[in-house]
Amino acid sequence: QYTDSVTYLMDGFKSANNSANNGKKNNAEEMKNLVNFLQSHKKLIKALKKNIESIQNKKHLIYKNKSYNPLLLSCVKKMNMLKENVDYIQKNQNLFKELMNQKATYSFVNTKKKIISLKSQGHKKETSQNQNENNDNQKYQEVNDEDDVNDEEDTNDDEDTNDEEDTNDDEDTNDDEDTNDEEDTNDEEDHENNNATAYELGIVPVNDVLNVNMKNMITGNNFMDVVKSTLAQSGGLGSNDLINFLNQGKEIGENLLNITKMNLGDKNNLESFPLDQLNMLKDNLINYEFILNNLKTSVLNKLKDLLLRLLYKAYVSYKKRKAQEKGLPEPTVTNEEYVEELKKGILDMGIKLLFSKVKSLLKKLKNKIFPKKKEDNQAVDTKSMEEPKVKAQPALRGVEPTEDSNIMNSINNVMDEIDFFEKELIENNNTPNVVPPTQSKKKNKNETVSGMDENFDNHPENYFKEEYYYDENDDMEVKVKKIGVTLKKFEPLKNGNVSETIKLIHLGNKDKKHIEAINNDIQIIKQELQAIYNELMNYTNGNKNIQQIFQQNILENDVLNQETEEEMEKQVEAITKQIEAEVDALAPKNKEEEEKEKEK
């Protein structure tokens, strides 16, 4: 039902544009291509900066052998590639300005006339070096620059309605939702520094995403803060950043032109390479990279704005289609109701999409904070006949888990809850009384982890299997699963029959405590279910009242329009009769004049 609803939502919006715009791209797609190009441009600048630093560190070697130095040759190639990119930007600056200053409407641009393949320009190949500090001989290889922009841009895409088919396995808006990655989080420094206690993803702190209550996530409060702040921004985002970027790029181009005036086919020309100008070039590249980051952030903000408004248009299209099917008048929205109507649309149609996007975001976030080592990714082909490993205790007594471990557990808990909610929403879409898992209990840092039960008598006849017992530190989802296992195991005792899987039937102390804990948790679940059910009913009643007022206003407008038309018709009839009477009054005079002329 989730897939059908998303497809149904987009069919009405896409079908009107499919035939007329087969050869065109929408603004959001072009903005993504622009971001990809800027990302590739940024990587080329970083590679050139590293190359310049290597040359400066080995000046004494390069002065001795300029002609056949591969490090110097690679630097010249990179500078030529950068010069081509800068020339490309200068020639197509009108296209950049048009994309940055466009209005946030779903319009199309003609790719044949205006677009000069931003995507292909961003996919240029650049040369990079593998440096070996203990060896003067350098080896170089071609590397492909086709990496995507950022994970958060994929998260922003979670609102991209042109990619709705991809959202079932996705990302943006993300989405948490539509937040942009303002810095390149793919840097090696981020992978090395995994012990930091505060992680941020764009402008949204990760802790806010992990610690948010599931109930607040359903109501969309945090998401709507991002939506409102985006819609409140004025048009022409990043125009100053673009001007600074173009001016600095022009200066870089002139600098590169002076340095690279040589024929690369003849390696002897490297003798004239001006090493003394590299310091000034490096300083200019640092300034250029800073301006490039600001421009990239502005483009991502603009892309986020486009995608949010595109989601709103898709929602309006869906509501109109539903109204036509039910024979109701098409709903209209004023500018004052824009944000509130967008909020209703997200709550009505976007909650399931939100679940999948948040889960995808958390997976990518976990991979970035805790990157897997190469040794972990290598598959083990040989199968050894080893004894089964015994599960270790969560932690020794009195030992606190690390900060990274807490973050990892928080991410896993949120992902598990999303899986539970998503499953219940799909299977019980028409029933409001879905039993959600409660928020996991936050463990105090000073709390000791209980490794075993002191009250448990270590006798095999006192339990069936250890797996269905749970302690107070378990998540509610785990408890719910173990409740089901418990009910299945104790069902034969209730009927007086012995199950084949139960060999030892003896209700010990631990079993009684276990059943009491189950009853307590069931009562807690009922209370939370009742609270959520009441909130859903209040929200549904509020929507019904708004819809009734909306339809009543439409009917009143129709009545006023009919009365106005009737009055206009009456006035037209009165004027027509008056004109006819004046014409009839003039007719006899005209006949008398004609008779007098005949007599003469």
Curated annotation (Swiss-Prot):
Residues 143-191 have a biased composition (Acidic residues). It is found in: Cell membrane; Parasitophorous vacuole lumen; Secreted. Sequence repeats lie at residues 143-148, 149-154, 155-160, 161-166, 167-172, 173-178, 179-184, 185-190. Residues 429-438 have a biased composition (Low complexity). Residues 281-445 are annotated as: Interaction with MSP1 and host SLC4A1/Band 3. Residues 128-141 have a biased composition (Polar residues). Keywords: Cell membrane, Malaria, Membrane, Repeat, Secreted. One of its GO terms (cellular component) is extracellular region. Not glycosylated. It is a peripheral membrane protein. Residues 119-199, 376-404, 429-457 are annotated as: Disordered. It comes from the Eukaryota. The keyword Repeat applies. The keyword Glycosyltransferase does not apply. Coiled coil: none annotated. Residues 143-190 are annotated as: 8 X 6 AA tandem repeats of [VT]-N-D-[ED]-[ED]-D. Residues 376-390 have a biased composition (Basic and acidic residues). During the asexual blood stage, involved in the sialic acid-independent (SAID) merozoite invasion of host erythrocytes by binding to host SLC4A1/Band 3 protein on the surface of the host erythrocyte. Belongs to the plasmodium ABRA family. Forms a complex composed of MSP1, MSP6, MSP7, MSP9 and MSP3; within the complex, MSP6 and MSP9 mediate the binding to the host erythrocyte. Interacts with MSP1 subunits p19 and p42; the interaction is direct. Interacts with host SLC4A1/Band 3 protein (via the 5ABC region). MSP1 subunits p19 or p42, and MSP9 form a co-ligand complex that interacts with host SLC4A1/Band 3 protein. This is Merozoite surface protein 9. It comes from Plasmodium falciparum (isolate FCR-3 / Gambia). The lineage of its organism: Eukaryota, Sar, Alveolata, Apicomplexa, Aconoidasida. The gene is MSP9.
